Amino acid sequence: MRKHAFGVVLVLVAFLMVTGCSGGKPNTYTDPSSTISVRSNQEFIIALEANATTGFAWEAVYDESILQLVSQNYVPDEHEEGMVGVGGTDHLRFKALKTGKTEIELTYKQPWVEGEGEYDQHLTFKVEIK
């Protein structure tokens, strides 16, 4: 009986170690005043309010030797069927490639407008990779 209980405990500990070490869901950040702190090879998401129906989108400028943009997708807010012009959230998923400090400069703009548009918005997120 003791051997059986020990085996069960051993399997449970092994399971917890494996699941505890699997990265899980990446952290999501929305506040540019807080520094994003991640480990090398870790992914994170910056989620920002947006409204794709206006033609505006978030454009990211970042150091490609330190960060990789894995994906960018827009998710509209829940709304009644048939509604148009509904806002949503733009999710920019990054992967930290190596240790260091960097910034992600984000501009909310209409891509076809040359130079600075009247309604453009700018945000800067600081990133520290350990």
What is each of the regions a protein language model found here?
Residues M1-V8:
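Bacterial N-terminal signal peptides that target proteins for export
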Residues M17-G20:
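C-terminal motif of bacterial Sec signal peptides marking the signal peptidase cleavage site
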Residues S22-I46:
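N-terminal edge beta-strand
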Residues V84-H91:
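Aromatic sugar-binding surface patches on proteins
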Residues F94-I104:
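Glycine-centered tight-turn and secondary-structure capping sites
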Residues V113-Q121:
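Beta-sandwich strand segments
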